[in-house]
């Protein structure tokens, strides 16, 4: 929230008993260099909106408070009601109070006018996370039959400045629904993700657009490219699962084999990458980790040169799945699982040593014959 803005005052003083002297004339402004002229032009452009005629930025020196505008004289502002005994009351700036007092007034009146529409822009500039303002703006967009493409340009600029704001992404989604035109979306989202590839607001919007408008083509190639750039990006692994689950699925043996081998290759590049291990477990666990042909042998082959806590924990899961499915050499498999739990507790994942010892005790109590369980367990 903006802080309260103080207003400084100054007075010219002279010597005691002497008449006040007029201030000296101001020096002439220095000639603007080309760069300064360009900056001044940009500042002038920023003060006016390409969407709302007559809109002035709140930072403009010519901005006038709503209470001082003749065209708003018919409105009684509605102050915020914090109750009789507010605790830790927010100190709003004068502009903030003024804008939102008038916004509450037009909201109560359900005033669907051009001036109310312009007011929402000021309110959004002060707090773009206020969902009530966005909702009322959408009501006005429909009632005033505004150009939705202009509104798309407006929301694009705001998202570029505030890419992690729930309300701005929801507003964009509604506009895309109204326009029934996703043609700008994937490129726009890719641009946002190029700045922060883990922005879950952008990923959520991308998934909605792809699913709503059936834009599955080339998405897996896009995911491949992002994983080449950052194989640790859990958001991209999640997108890979989303795309395949909604297209080919994993029931096709060829697809599953491709994904298993793809993931193992990514693991070889970065063995300590938990995201890849989670993906591998996610695509196999419904069918049973121990039932995938040759997976155990491939993991054991990785262990000497690519060992990590995640590999060992995955092996524990595989052995547990084998025990659950009544394997022939149950005692041997149990001992291997218990040995790995101890390695994790003592060497590879000591911060969670008590967890791994708990897993070991649970495996013993579930899969040991009662007479075989050590007295200390």
From Swiss-Prot:
Q: Where are this protein's PFTA repeats?
A: 112-146, 147-181, 182-214, 215-249, 255-289
Name the catalysed reactions: L-cysteinyl-[protein] + (2E,6E)-farnesyl diphosphate = S-(2E,6E)-farnesyl-L-cysteinyl-[protein] + diphosphate; geranylgeranyl diphosphate + L-cysteinyl-[protein] = S-geranylgeranyl-L-cysteinyl-[protein] + diphosphate
Top enzyme class: transferase
- Residue ranges annotated as compositionally biased, kind Pro residues, are 19-32
Provide the GO biological process annotations. Answer: enzyme-linked receptor protein signaling pathway; positive regulation of Rac protein signal transduction; positive regulation of skeletal muscle acetylcholine-gated channel clustering; protein farnesylation; protein geranylgeranylation; regulation of microtubule-based movement
As for PTM, the annotation reads: Phosphorylated. Phosphorylation is mediated by MUSK upon AGRIN stimulation and results in the activation of FNTA.
Explain the regulation of its activity.
Activated by the AGRIN-induced phosphorylation which is mediated by MUSK.
User: Which one Pfam family would you cite for this protein?
Assistant: PPTA
Cite the effect that the entry attributes to residue 164 to A. Answer: Inhibits prenylation activity. In myoblasts, impaired insulin-induced RAC1 activation, possibly due to impaired insulin-induced geranyl-geranyltransferase activation. No effect on MUSK-binding
**GO MF entries:** acetyltransferase activator activity; alpha-tubulin binding; CAAX-protein geranylgeranyltransferase activity; microtubule binding; protein farnesyltransferase activity; protein geranylgeranyltransferase activity; Rab geranylgeranyltransferase activity; receptor tyrosine kinase binding
Q: Which InterPro entries match?
A: Prenyl_trans_a
As for family, the record states: Belongs to the protein prenyltransferase subunit alpha family.
User: Tell me, how does this one assemble?
Assistant: Heterodimer of FNTA and FNTB (farnesyltransferase). Heterodimer of FNTA and PGGT1B (geranylgeranyltransferase).
The record's function comment reads:
Essential subunit of both the farnesyltransferase and the geranylgeranyltransferase complex. Contributes to the transfer of a farnesyl or geranylgeranyl moiety from farnesyl or geranylgeranyl diphosphate to a cysteine at the fourth position from the C-terminus of several proteins having the C-terminal sequence Cys-aliphatic-aliphatic-X. May positively regulate neuromuscular junction development downstream of MUSK via its function in RAC1 prenylation and activation.
This protein is called Protein farnesyltransferase/geranylgeranyltransferase type-1 subunit alpha
Query: What is the species of this protein?
Result: Mus musculus (Mouse)
């Amino acid at each position: 929230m903006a802080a309260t803005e103080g207003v400084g005052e100054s007075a010219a003083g002279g010597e005691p008993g002497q008449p006040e002297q007029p201030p000296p004339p101001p020096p002439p402004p220095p000639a603007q260099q080309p760069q300064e002229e360009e900056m001044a032009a940009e500042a002038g452009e920023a003060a006016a909106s390409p969407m709302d005629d007559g809109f002035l930025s709140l930072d403009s020196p010519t901005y006038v408070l709503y209470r001082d505008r003749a065209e708003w004289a018919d409105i009684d502002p509605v102050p915020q009601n914090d109750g009789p005994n507010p605790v830790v009351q927010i100190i709003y700036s004068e502009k903030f109070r003024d804008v939102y007092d008038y916004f509450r007034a037009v909201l109560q009146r359900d005033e669907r006018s051009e001036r109310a529409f312009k007011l929402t822009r000021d309110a959004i500039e002060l707090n773009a996370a206020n969902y009530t303002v966005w909702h009322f703006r959408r009501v006005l967009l429909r009632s005033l039959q505004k150009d939705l493409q202009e509104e798309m340009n407006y929301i694009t600029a705001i998202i570029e400045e505030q890419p992690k704001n729930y309300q701005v992404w929801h507003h964009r989604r509604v506009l895309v629904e109204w326009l029934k035109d996703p043609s700008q979306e994937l490129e726009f989202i890719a641009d946002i993700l190029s700045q922060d590839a883990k922005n879950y607001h952008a990923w959520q919007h991308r998934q909605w657009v792809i699913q709503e408008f059936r834009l599955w083509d080339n998405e897996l190639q896009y995911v491949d490219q992002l994983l080449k750039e950052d194989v640790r990006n859990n958001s991209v692994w999640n997108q890979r699962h989303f795309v395949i689950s909604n297209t080919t699925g994993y029931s096709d043996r060829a697809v599953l084999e491709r994904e298993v081998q793809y993931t193992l290759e990514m693991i070889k590049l970065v063995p300590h990458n938990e995201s890849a291990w989670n993906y591998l477990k996610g695509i196999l666990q419904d069918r049973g980790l121990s039932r995938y042909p040759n997976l155990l042998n491939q993991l054991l082959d990785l262990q000497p040169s690519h060992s990590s806590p995640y590999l060992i924990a995955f092996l524990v899961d595989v052995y547990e799945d084998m025990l659950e499915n009544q394997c022939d050499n149950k005692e041997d498999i149990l001992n291997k699982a218990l040995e790995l739990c101890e390695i994790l507790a003592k060497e590879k994942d000591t911060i969670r040593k008590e967890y791994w010892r708990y897993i070991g005790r649970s495996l013993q109590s579930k899969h040991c014959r009662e007479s075989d369980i050590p007295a200390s367990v």
